[in-house]
């Protein structure tokens, strides 16, 4: 009996170990690191949501859904370093997603050993700091949790439990609500269900997703004082439009640059998937009953649809990394069929090839990563945990390392409890660092607002005169519209320069420099 229990749970135990030794190990070292702009935006959303809701106010209707930030906003009710807390939450969700995906590949491949080799390799790639930075950079791994769980449940569907498609639909909808661009995965799943099971089962999937999706949207609308439901979706495209001028200039360049970065990181997995695809088609031509071509096309679609996101907005390497789960599914299918139809000697050679290729593919990047000073810590878990309570962001030695921290320290000294702040040029991280909030969603990023006003200085002057943020830090980044912001601020007649964040090549985020302006009428 004990032997059967151990064998039954062996895969789960190994999945947990693989997740901890790859995802956990790579991420935990970076948790105490300095603030960065991507995570700063999500952290600001959490800050704002908590501030509004805890004060009994409604969320401004023009704020995006940002469900991940909303459900984690409770950290602002605790006397801790919220940056660190949110990174810990992101790590825990990434561990959960890693375990679930291991189980998906184990089921798809039918091999525990194959899963250990391939999933370990892909997790080392996907959790490299260059893609995830320091945690809570975006909602990708949070959305993976319901999506991978839906995949795992779908692999265990039989004629007696078709009711589970309601649950699968709900999980898929949750994944989309957490990260809106993943609606492409949702649509892919819907098409796959239709082809595999017919329209009656598809209806169950759609009903499940509708129940959870519309219920969640209903509460989100209530939190926004019953605003127009279309505003929630419009706000997502608002954010895309604020990058529109950059996308027009850099869309093609970014696509090729960052796709090549992703290919270089996972070239060995692409090779596995390519040969697996050829092998599956070879078997299909021999006898269609030998393989499930529908299943292959499902995994292929999962590998390709993330590319669509990079074609409609400015794409980066971490967007292309979302192709990896689909590629891994193709490789797992190929191994399962090879295990069924090939001789033992062939399987041994193929497995040896996979191991050698995985090591040669992962080793160069992982060795460079592990040679970074951040991985010299002897007690990374306790160090990251202690930063929850004793943050080094307020220590002068740490402040000197980052222009974000330098700017935040200056702004805090120049403000009081009731002050507000406006920034420009990827500086939203300053809101949670200073504890200040913008006067509105529009003034959260003045460059984005300026763009949406078609660079109309008069309109922006009127908005600043009407809303009067206490402090403005426009930064001097090389972005369209930034050079004209200082002129706009001066035209209001309301502000004076009170500090300068100097450019220094020896600090992190050195481009976050420039003048800090404050209302002339400010009273300390």
What are these regions (language model features)?
Residues 164-179, 186-191, 303-311:
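Membrane-interface alpha helices of multi-pass inner-membrane proteins
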Residues 131-141:
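Short acidic/glycine- and proline-prone juxtamembrane loop motifs at membrane-interface regions
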Residues 3, 99, 264-295, 300-305:
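Hydrophobic, aromatic-rich transmembrane alpha-helices
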Residues 203-248, 264-271, 307-311:
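Membrane-lumen/periplasm interface segments of specific transmembrane helices
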Residues 17, 88-109, 124, 148:
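Transmembrane-helix motifs of polytopic, lipid-linked glycan transferases
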Residues 30-45, 59-74, 80-81, 399-403:
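Extracytoplasmic catalytic/substrate-binding loops of multi-pass membrane glycan-assembly enzymes
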Residues 184, 312-353:
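Hydrophobic/aromatic-rich transmembrane helices and adjacent perimembrane loops
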Residues 181, 226-227, 357-522:
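Extracytoplasmic
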């Amino acid at each position: 009996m004990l032997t059967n229990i151990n064998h039954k749970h062996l895969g789960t135990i190994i999945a947990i170990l693989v997740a901890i030794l790859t995802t956990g190990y790579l991420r935990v070292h970076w948790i105490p690191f300095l603030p960065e702009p991507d995570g700063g935006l999500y952290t600001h959303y959490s800050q704002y949501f908590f501030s509004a809701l805890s004060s009994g106010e409604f969320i401004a209707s023009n704020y995006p859904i940002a469900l991940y930030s909303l459900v984690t906003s409770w950290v602002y009710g605790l006397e801790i370093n919220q940056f660190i807390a949110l990174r810990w939450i992101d790590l825990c969700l990434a561990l959960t997603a890693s375990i679930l995906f291991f189980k998906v590949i184990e089921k798809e491949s039918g091999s525990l050993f194959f899963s250990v080799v391939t999933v370990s390799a892909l997790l080392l790639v996907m959790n490299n700091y260059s893609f995830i930075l320091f945690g809570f950079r975006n909602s990708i791994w949070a959305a993976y949790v319901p999506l991978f769980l839906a995949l795992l449940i779908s692999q265990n569907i039989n004629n007696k439990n078709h009711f589970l498609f309601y649950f699968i639909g709900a999980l898929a909808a949750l994944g989309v609500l957490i990260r809106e661009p993943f609606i492409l995965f949702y649509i892919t799943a819907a098409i796959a269900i239709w082809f595999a099971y017919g329209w009656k089962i598809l209806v169950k999937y759609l009903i499940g997703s509708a129940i959870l999706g519309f219920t969640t949207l209903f509460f989100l609308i209530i939190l926004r004082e019953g605003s127009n439901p279309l505003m929630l979706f419009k706000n997502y495209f608002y954010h895309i439009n604020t990058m529109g001028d950059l996308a027009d200039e850099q869309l093609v360049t970014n696509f090729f640059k960052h796709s090549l970065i992703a290919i270089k990181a996972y070239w060995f997995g692409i090779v596995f998937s390519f040969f697996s695809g050829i092998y599956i088609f070879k078997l299909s031509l021999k006898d269609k009953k030998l393989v499930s071509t529908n299943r292959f096309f499902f995994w292929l679609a999962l590998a390709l649809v993330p590319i669509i996101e990079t074609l409609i907005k400015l794409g980066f390497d971490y967007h292309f990394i979302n192709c990896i789960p689909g590629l891994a599914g193709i490789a797992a299918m190929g191994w399962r069929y090879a295990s069924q139809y090939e001789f033992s000697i062939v399987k041994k050679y193929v497995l040896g090839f996979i191991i050698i290729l995985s090591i040669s593919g992962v080793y160069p990047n992982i060795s460079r990563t592990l040679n970074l000073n951040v991985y010299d810590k002897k007690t990374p878990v306790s160090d990251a945990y202690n930063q929850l309570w004793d943050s080094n962001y307020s220590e002068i030695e740490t402040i000197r390392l980052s222009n974000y921290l330098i700017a935040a320290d200056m702004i805090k000294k120049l403000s009081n409890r009731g002050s507000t702040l406006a920034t420009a040029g990827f500086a939203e991280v300053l809101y949670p660092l200073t504890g200040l909030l913008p006067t509105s969603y529009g003034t959260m990023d003045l460059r984005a607002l300026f763009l949406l006003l078609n660079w109309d200085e008069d309109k922006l002057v009127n908005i600043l005169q009407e809303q009067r943020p206490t402090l403005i830090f426009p930064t001097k980044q090389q972005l369209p519209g930034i050079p004209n912001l200082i002129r706009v601020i001066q035209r209001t007649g309301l502000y004076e320069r009170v500090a300068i964040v100097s450019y220094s090549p020896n600090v992190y985020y050195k481009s976050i420099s420039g003048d800090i302006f404050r209302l002339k009428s400010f009273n300390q």
